[in-house]
Regions:
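Short, intrinsically disordered N-terminal pre-domain segments
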Residues: 1-15
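Protruding loop/beta-arch "assembly-hinge" segments enriched in small, turn-prone residues
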Residues: 122-147
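Short, low-complexity, charged/polar segments at coil/turn and helix-coil boundaries
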Residues: 14, 18-118
Length: 147
């Protein structure tokens, strides 16, 4: 007695591909939402004065999937009176894009404080980005569990 397969294999693979794409889209959305939350938290953290608004405006993220741009969030922020933060946005995007392109084989979210002096501000004891990024795993897990 022989067994004969009557299933259309191409339809089976089409369903598998559709489910794979659905899962990928869900994980990409979870990454995006987690990055947005972390960036928003970092921008709301008020431990330093940003006279030019460049440092706070340089905080943002970029998301790439296998080398392809997905989304980003960089916007003007701060209440300083010596600038509008536009330089911060440009620098933040530049640094994030450079970092994201080093991993063209993966889904990658890069969160940055793009001004060159961000590390020095943190070294003085002010929280620019580190405190928010320490919550990244918890925030991402929250969105993944909601899938």
């Amino acid at each position: 007695m022989s067994i004969k397969c009557t299933t259309d294999i191409s339809k089976l693979f089409a369903k598998i591909d559709a489910k794979t794409e659905e899962a990928k889209a869900s994980y990409t959305e979870a990454f995006e939402m987690a990055c947005r939350d972390i960036v928003n938290l970092a921008k709301r953290t008020n431990t330093y004065k940003d006279k030019t608004n460049n440092l706070r405006s340089s905080i943002g993220f970029i998301l790439y999937d296998r080398g392809e741009f997905v989304t980003e969030k960089f916007d003007m922020a701060g209440i300083g009176v010596e600038g509008d933060g536009s330089k911060g946005i440009v620098e933040g995007k530049r640094i994030a894009e450079e970092a994201a392109k080093t991993h063209p084989e993966a889904l990658i979210g890069v969160i940055v404080a793009g001004m060159e002096y961000a590390l020095y501000v943190e070294a003085k004891g002010y929280d620019v980005l580190t405190g928010s990024c320490l919550q990244a795993k918890t925030v991402l897990e929250k969105y993944i569990k909601a899938l």
